[in-house]
């Protein structure tokens, strides 16, 4: 948590600053598999996004094998293979900071996050009752930042409501805690997020 929040780590009382750029990627196996443990809400909240990966198609697996055979994943791959170097990443981070997000878009994002805490104002009662805990204020920050990053990837210097919608599930799915009844009924966080996005007015 210290590394993710403060960009430093403390070992034996000595503080070591972490290099820039720095990011944390983690994999999470299904909780029902042996040797897996549920992360706390505070730990999950530190992750900006959560993607869900399925098994690759046969064609994708074939491509993976071909790339391995071609040396794409070697420790010292040849130059010109499309990888980003550190300077390019730092340049993209600088460009990201220049993406404009209007106050109305920030308000829109905050309303979406607030709806996860007060779902009865936005969802049918039987669905609203399935949410045990809504997303924290950190979710609003992450939603706005992810929207700006999406805008940059789309080639725009400003964020629009569609950017917020495009990243909402990735930002919120791990921050909404559902009751056991939701799993029993086959209701997912993504389903509830869709419902909220349909109910929160778009600016």
Tell where the protein language model's regions lie, with residue ranges.
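Canonical AAA+ ATPase core
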Residues: 4-98, 148-150
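Helix N-cap and loop-to-helix transition residues
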Residues: 40, 57, 84-86, 102, ...
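Short coil/turn residues that cap or connect secondary-structure elements
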Residues: 13, 35, 97-100, 135, ...
